[in-house]
Regions:
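Aromatic-rich carbohydrate-binding modules that target alpha-glucans
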Residues: 11-61, 71-98
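Extracellular ectodomain segments of secreted/surface proteins
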Residues: 1-12
């Protein structure tokens, strides 16, 4: 799930990425906003409900592709993304519009 909160400057938006992943040991959000670096933006698990979450400030008016990397072995999309596009590997990437 994506939550977008405009920042006071009007030039950036705080994007909170959330993924229910009960039983997962690790989740990262990976996309063109971080060079597809699997280690750049790990999500933290909330103890009460098992949802993994992280926030990133991104420039307004941009379009980003991303996916979640779970337990260093599988990809998953955000099913509340703004859109989806084929990624060239026979799957789709999630799309975020800021």
């Amino acid at each position: 799930m994506l939550k977008k909160t405009p920042l006071a400057s009007g030039k950036k938006v705080k994007v909170t990425f959330e993924l229910p992943a009960n039983g997962a040991a690790s989740v990262s959000v990976v996309g063109d906003f971080n060079g597809w670096d699997k280690d750049a933006n790990p999500l933290k698990a909330r103890k009460k409900d098992g949802v993994f979450s992280a926030s990133i400030n991104l420039p307004v008016g941009q379009v980003y592709q991303f996916r979640y990397w779970i337990d260093n072995q599988r990809w998953e999309n955000d099913w509340a993304a703004d859109d989806y596009v084929p990624n060239g590997f026979g799957e789709d990437n999630s799309v975020l519009h800021t």
